[in-house]
C-alpha cells in the first residue's frame, strides 16, 4: 500500500496548487480527483464560458468591424460542432498543463471514479 505525507482531495485550483506546494516543501504528496484535473472552473465553468465568449467576440468583429477595415464579409456560417470541439481543445490543453505541473513537481495523481474506501486510514 502506498504511503504519503499529504493527500489532497480535489484537483481544482486550490487543490492542485496546495499539492504542488507540499511537494516543493519535500513532502511525499498525492492528489485524488474524481473527474478532471483543474476542477469545475477549468473544465465546465469559467474557462469554457470564456472561450465561447471569445468566439462570439470574434464573430461580432467579423460582422461589424471587418467592413470598416475594408474587408467585405458576405456572410459567416457557424459550425457549432467545430466550435464545441475548439472549446474542448482549450479546456483539454489547460487541464494537460495542470497535469504537467503536478507531474513536474512529483505529485502522484490518483484518478478515482468512485467513493474512497472507508477503510483507508488518514493520520
PLM-predicted stretches and their roles:
Residues 1-14:
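Beta1/beta-strand and adjacent pyrophosphate-binding region of the FAD-binding site
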Residues 2-3, 20-27, 32-123:
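Glycine-rich flavin
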Amino acid at each position: 500500500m502506498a504511503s504519503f505525507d499529504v493527500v489532497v482531495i480535489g484537483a481544482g485550483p486550490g487543490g492542485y496548487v496546495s499539492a504542488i506546494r507540499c511537494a516543493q516543501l519535500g513532502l511525499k504528496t498525492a492528489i485524488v480527483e474524481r473527474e478532471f484535473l483543474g476542477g469545475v472552473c477549468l473544465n465546465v465553468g469559467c474557462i469554457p464560458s470564456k472561450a465561447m465568449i471569445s468566439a462570439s467576440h470574434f464573430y461580432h468583429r467579423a460582422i461589424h468591424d471587418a467592413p470598416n477595415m475594408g474587408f467585405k464579409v458576405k456572410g459567416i456560417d457557424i459550425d457549432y460542432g467545430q466550435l464545441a470541439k475548439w472549446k474542448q481543445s482549450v479546456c483539454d490543453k489547460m487541464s494537460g498543463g495542470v497535469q504537467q505541473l503536478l507531474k513536474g513537481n512529483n505529485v502522484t495523481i490518483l484518478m478515482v471514479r468512485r467513493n474512497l474506501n472507508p477503510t483507508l486510514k488518514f493520520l
